[in-house]
Structure formats: structure tokens, C-alpha cells
Amino acid sequence: MSIVIIGSGQAGFEAAVSLRSHGFSGTITLVGDEPGVPYQRPPLSKAYLHSDPDRESLALRPAQYFDDHRITLTCGKPVVRIDRDAQRVELIDATAIEYDHLILATGARNRLLPVPGANLPGVHYLRTAGEAESLTSSMASCSSLVVIGAGFIGLEVAAAARKKGLDVTVVEAMDRPMARALSSVMSGYFSTAHTEHGVHMRLSTGVKTINAADGRAAGVTTNSGDVIHADAVVVGIGVVPNIELAALTGLPVDNGIVVDEYLRTPDENISAIGDCAAYPIPGKAGLVRLESVQNAVDQARCLAAQLTGTSTHYRSVPWFWSEQYESKLQMAGLTAGADTHVVRGSVDSGVFSIFCFLGTRLLGVESVNKPRDHMAARKILATEMPLTPEQAADTDFDLKLAIARHKDTHKDEVASADIGERQVVAS
């Protein structure tokens, strides 16, 4: 049996590794757009910006690993066509590779800013190692920076730039940072944190143009006509899923490649995982597409188990993290639609959690410097343990003890949830 994986990011890499760890003995071909071995992306906006770039430190495995595990790594040669009838993919150099099963792990790409000046030298995006190296070099030679977009990437870049002593202005179209992902309380905490560290936060502000001087980016003009001068500009306004290959071959797409709870497309010989996959979540209307290492890894492991004989649907509690200054933000669950937000701890102390409810149902938890709350939240969400807003607010209420008691009184249900988690979390 031959398995071809399109995309050598976290999801594609993990699929290849997990297939071997599950005993798959057939042919594995991992095809990636970028040159070199698969590498980690999260450090690019974190530790990588704080030190001299060392691409080797990002590698998920050294090149020899792929030879040792009989994984054919095809780098820097994008797939341009999928022939579903012939079950083969065609690369940009006209090479054809046949498959018995195809895994689409095509990921996502930067959303481009559609304004004049967006293509000027000195305008940076941040998703690849090459882009991180370019940004790091630029930050070393400039004294001021404008960051367009107050999402996770934008704010992590802003924090790194402030630590390097740059004057930083963040321009965000919405009225609060990380608004699509976080509660208003948590957004407010990070807005204050950045302001206290010297970042100029320009919220509810759009960008009209990126300005030029001597042929390079020199700042921006806002929609209200304000001119903000800077030596470089970083654009972090989200990503777009890479769904074109799937769409061209007739697979359904809907802000992602549409898959079922088993990560299968309507073509039984093609699956999709990671940032490019739109999949159903029980109890949530429509499809969800998540951009996280956890989702990429867990989906890859779940699919590898299926392809080697263990039939199981994908279920895993989503979790995310971000590091900004002294604050480590950890999120569990999906909190969109929450109508009640309960603070556990003290926001002013910088050590607290926000439990997000819809009625009496816990949707998710946002934690700052409280890893125990984060781990408890993942267990509560995985086992659907009842928790009231009053209990969440009470710091004397022992979450760990409540989880243990729930486990003892619901052994069969918890065991089933634990098995599902292990199937997607354990390597």
C-alpha cells in the first residue's frame, strides 16, 4: 500500500511518523512546498524572534530520520494536480506519484493585506522560517515597527520587538485585541499588558496605505488619515486555508476541505487533516477549522490509527497557547457564543482563569499563568463533567478533587472519553 501526504508541516509530518509507529509497512511519500526537513512553526513568533535564528533548532527530525524510517521526503516541489481517477499526484516538475490513499495536509497561508504599498520591501509576514529570518534581520536594523493586526501572531511579534527596544505601534481594525478568540476580559488584560510595556495600541483603526520612503516601507496611513511612521511593517491578519488542490479535483470545500468525523472526504481514498480541514464537532453547528499544533497532531494520529486498522472518530478537546511578555496564555475548548464569563482568581495579579459558559454548559477556559486550571479544564471538557459558574468562581472549590470524584462515579463514561483522548493524543 502506498500513502502520499501533501504538506510537510506539523500535520503531514505527524501523519508520516504515526503511520510508522502504528506498524504501517507500506510506502510513505511526504511532499512539501518548502525546502528542507519539516520544522516547527510556533517558535517562529516566540523564541525564534528573541535570539539569533537557527533553523536547525526548528527541525522536527533530522534528515537521517526520514531515511531510517523509509519516509520519502520530497521538498520544494509543490503538487499542482490530483488525478483522482488514476490515483496519482503531479508535481510542479511533472513528476507523477501514485497513491492508494492520499492525505491532504496542505495547511494555510498568510492572508494578504489588500492596500497600496503592501508589496514594498520592509513589509513582513510571519508563517515560514524564511519569513521569520527576514523579520529578525529587519528588527535588528530598525528602531520602530508597525504591526497590523492584534491577533496572536501580531501581539507575539509586538512583544518580541518591545523586548528588543523597538518603538511599536499595533493597528487593529476591531475594538479589542484577539477579539475572535478571547473573551473581552482576557482581551482587556492583554491590551493593558501591551500598553504597560510601551506598545501604542490603535484599536478600531484600519489601514488605508502602507507608505514608502526610499523605495521601502516607512509606516502606514490609517483610514482616518493619521500617519504612523516606522522603519518596517508586519502584517498579521490571519491565514487562508490551502484548499485549491481539493477544489480543483472536485472535493467539497467550505472554508476548508470538508471531512466527516473520521477525517474522510467523500472520496474514500482521500483524507484531510490540520489547518486545511473543516470537520464537525458534536454539539456545535456547522463545520470547524482549527489552526493549532494540537489539532494538527491529534488529527494526524487519529487518521494514522484508522489507516492501520483502528476505526475511531476524531474527538479531542481543542487547546491553544500564546506567550507574551511574562504572561503565558492557555486556552481549552471553543468559547465562541459564551454568554457568561466567570473569573477565577485575580486579573490584577496576572494569575487567573476565565471560565466561559453558555447557560450552565462550560464551553472553554482561558488561563493566564495557571497551568493547573488549564489541565483541569481539558479534563472537565473531555469528560463533560458538570461544573456550575458558582463553582468555577470559587477558588476554594477543588477542581482536581471534583474531577477525581466524577471519574469514580462515572467510570464507564470517563473510560470511554479517556480512550478517545489516548487514541488522538498518544503517539
Curated annotation (Swiss-Prot):
GO molecular function: oxidoreductase activity, acting on NAD(P)H
EC number: 1.18.1.-
Binding site for FAD: 2-34
Binding-site positions, NAD(+): 144-172
Keywords assigned by UniProt, alphabetized: FAD, Flavoprotein, NAD, Oxidoreductase
SUPFAM superfamilies per record: FAD/NAD(P)-binding domain, FAD/NAD-linked reductases, dimerisation (C-terminal) domain
InterPro entries recorded: FAD-oxidoreductase/Apoptosis (IPR050446), FAD/NAD-bd_sf (IPR036188), FAD/NAD-binding_dom (IPR023753), FAD/NAD-linked_Rdtase_dimer_sf (IPR016156), Reductase_C (IPR028202)
GO cellular component terms listed in the entry, alphabetical order: cytoplasm
Cofactor: FAD
Job of this protein: The degradation of the thiocarbamate herbicide EPTC by cytochrome CYP116 (thcB) requires the participation of a flavoprotein, rhodocoxin reductase, and an iron-sulfur protein, rhodocoxin, to mediate the transfer of electrons from NADH to P450 for oxygen activation.
Sequence similarity: Belongs to the FAD-dependent oxidoreductase family.
Protein name: Rhodocoxin reductase
Native species: Rhodococcus erythropolis (Arthrobacter picolinophilus)
